[in-house]
Amino acid sequence: MVKPLRLNDRHQQILRATVQHYIATAEPVGSHTLAQEYQFAVSSATIRNALGQLEKAGLLYQPHVSAGRVPSDSGYRIYVDNLLTWSDRQSRTVKQRLENEINGDNWHFEALIQRMGQILAGLSGYIALITFPQTETVQLRHLQLMLLPSHQILIILVTDSYHTHSATLDLPAAMEAKEEGELEQELAIFSNFLNAQLRGKNLSELSHLNWQELDQKFSIYADFLKGLQQQIKPLLQRRMAGPLVVHGVSKVIQQPEFSQLEQVQMLLSLLEQEQDKLFSLLFDPDNYGDNLANLGQEMNLLTGETMPKTRPVVTIRIGAENPLESMHPCTLVSAIYRQQEIPMGSVSILGPTRMVYQQTIPLVEQAAECLSEALSKN
């Protein structure tokens, strides 16, 4: 059973050193190695005791009994959120390097995306994934709510391309005692209200819609509205999108984490056959700014240094935080690029959880900023 552990300075230092050493070597880390290579000013036995406490807390684990420790997904999460820092100067250096690689040429944007993918794969050693700008999006044409005998509400959604989607949601508890005729009349009124609010809107516009204001106008439908939002989003995400730019696969499959054929096959299947699932994960504006890793809020807890809010928000999903099982051995680092505050696409790097986070995160952040600046000039 995992026991909670309040990390003191020593725990933080040993966890940071363990993660960094494992990232660099891909070899389990023992107390003797840490005592020799890092200046902790404590004995090997003290380090060994701290490693045991970190393991009990679920931040490290042993691949087998006689081995050293390696970071768990939770260990990487603590490392990324609390122990990893970099300065504005480092970010400026990364951006300058990207601009030098692009050579300041007057690229067409599609060619720039291809080139940026090559650069990110080359600099990181991982897979670069960039979505093309989403200029054409599916819009909601009509919404209808119907009462079912099972005290559920049938939602029928029709897009501007006349694609139909249906789903059921539970009737709000506050309405269960009402008569059937009264319910049907109220649902008709609510349907008309929702059509007036949502008709003609695409996913980007719905993402910026004040759903809280809708909750206030029809407070008894608050939970229903949350469910409705989740039903609408996947439908409107079926975009008329350009191809997903993918570079760097050959480098990643050389990593020790992908030494087994089955692991390589799962990764290739994800990139070749599950792009629809991957696309919705890469480009969902609502996912950026959630609690997965809002850099500028959580990255510098130890130093107190904050990042400018104007930077692209970088989302980091580590291991099992990824909803697709084929991505559980991986970390996905993503940021949205924009045109005048409108989300247009995303820049991502996909690699093993044993990722050089200190290098990868600024790369994604600054690549998104470069693409946003390029779009603003068009």
Curated annotation (Swiss-Prot):
Entry's Gene Ontology molecular function annotations: DNA binding
SUPFAM superfamilies: GAF domain-like, Winged helix' DNA-binding domain
Biological processes per GO annotation: negative regulation of DNA-templated transcription
KW Glycoprotein (keyword) present: no
Pfam families: HrcA
Keyword vocabulary terms for this entry: Repressor, Stress response, Transcription, Transcription regulation
Gene3D superfamilies recorded: 3.30.450.40, Heat-inducible transcription repressor hrca homolog, domain 3, Winged helix-like DNA-binding domain superfamily/Winged helix DNA-binding domain
Family according to the record: Belongs to the HrcA family.
NCBIfam families from the UniProt entry: hrcA (TIGR00331)
Record function comment: Negative regulator of class I heat shock genes (grpE-dnaK-dnaJ and groELS operons). Prevents heat-shock induction of these operons.
HAMAP family: HrcA
Record-given protein name: Heat-inducible transcription repressor HrcA
